[in-house]
Amino acid sequence: MKNDISELENRKLYILISKTHTVPARIIKFWTKEPYAHASIALDLELREMYSFARKGIYNPFNCGFIIEDIDTGIFGRDVETSCVVLELTVTDKQYRHVLQELAAFKANADLYRYNFWGLYGVIRNKAIERKYNYFCSQFVASVLERSGIHILDKQPGLVRPDDFRKSSNVKVIYKGLLRRYREYLWTHDLVQAFGGHVTKQAM
């Protein structure tokens, strides 16, 4: 499905899909038979303002909900072998502002939200299980986009898997490799481009 960006295209959003080596990630990967098990939405290229639904601490996989993510701390910081794909999505200024409003609502009511464990089972059965205040990671990202008028998938949010974002014709892959090397890649890419060179996007 094509995203309607008939207005001035002057905003970017970023979707991070990733695979850690935690037990839940391995289970999800086994169930879905897909390479990535987690999705997050970011407002900036460096992924410094990024949101998702996941565990709130490192050690308890069942204490999950809406979180502000940091690629240098938490599970990402602990698992230095986390692999990822960073996707860039062009949106209108109006759509971008709607995303900000959606995220502000999540932040203001963070204590109400829970992880949609049953929803993961629904994805496997191809039957969406959507409950108020309950989301899994890719359902959350898809819901924020859809409610902001950004239609890039042909699935309802409760059936969206992390890898569905990568398969969308509306996104641009800007990085694939180890998450811990992502910001280094950005710096190197900018430095090399300043001298008219080229740097690979694969940092394995």
Where on the chain are the PLM-derived regions?
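Cysteine-nucleophile amide-bond enzymes
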Residues: M1-M204
